[in-house]
Design a protein with these regions (language model features):
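Proteolytic processing junctions in secreted/extracellular precursors
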Residues: 5-15
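Active-site and NAD+-binding cores of ADP-ribose-processing enzymes
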Residues: 16-65, 79-161
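A short, exposed loop/beta-hairpin motif centered on an aromatic-Gly-Thr core
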Residues: 67-72
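Soluble catalytic regions of membrane-associated enzymes that act on cell-envelope
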Residues: 76
Length: 161
């Protein structure tokens, strides 16, 4: 069990959600096809879209959990090289996002299987649902960079770099 937790901690990087908080708010950044944002003052991103339409990045996350969510970066310059497009942003209260990287409420321990840990589409799924019952988003890492997965529809705005 100790080895599992140590490996999980290696899986996540050192930055915490608080590093991105400014006066209790976190800026979130999302890239989309430029056609989706052309001439619009704002868009509403709906996590249900993730269920039916996924890019390569989202497909990997889909294998981990099929729980509906929209992905955001906490730093628009710190993204995978493959990610491009029109940049959108929004700000949300930090306290609406659960910091899974530090896991202060022990969700990982609560949901992990005693032998197999957090299995894709199993414990990950129930853990996301449980976190969503108290939070609107979750901060974690799927390698590098860190992301916020938002569980609810959210209004976003065009963002100039």
């Amino acid at each position: 069990m100790k080895l599992l937790i140590e490996n999980f901690k290696k899986y996540i990087s050192e930055e915490s959600l608080g590093d991105f908080s400014d006066e209790g708010m976190v800026n979130l950044y999302h890239y989309t096809n430029p056609r989706n944002a052309d001439g619009k003052d704002s868009l509403v991103l709906d996590p249900q879209y993730f269920v039916t339409s996924r890019g390569a990045y989202s497909k990997r996350e889909w294998e981990t959990s099929r729980y509906p969510r929209t992905f955001f970066y906490t730093d628009y310059d710190n993204k995978e090289p493959i990610v491009d497009g029109a940049l959108l942003s929004t700000s949300v209260p930090t306290n609406e996002i659960y910091d899974l990287k530090n896991d202060p409420e022990g969700y990982v321990e609560k949901h992990r299987h005693p032998t197999y840990g957090l299995r894709k589409q199993m414990e990950w799924e129930t853990m996301m649902k449980d976190i969503h019952s108290s939070y609107r988003g979750i901060y974690y890492s799927i390698g590098k960079p860190n992301v916020v997965a938002w569980f609810n529809p959210i209004e976003v705005f065009p963002h100039e770099k």
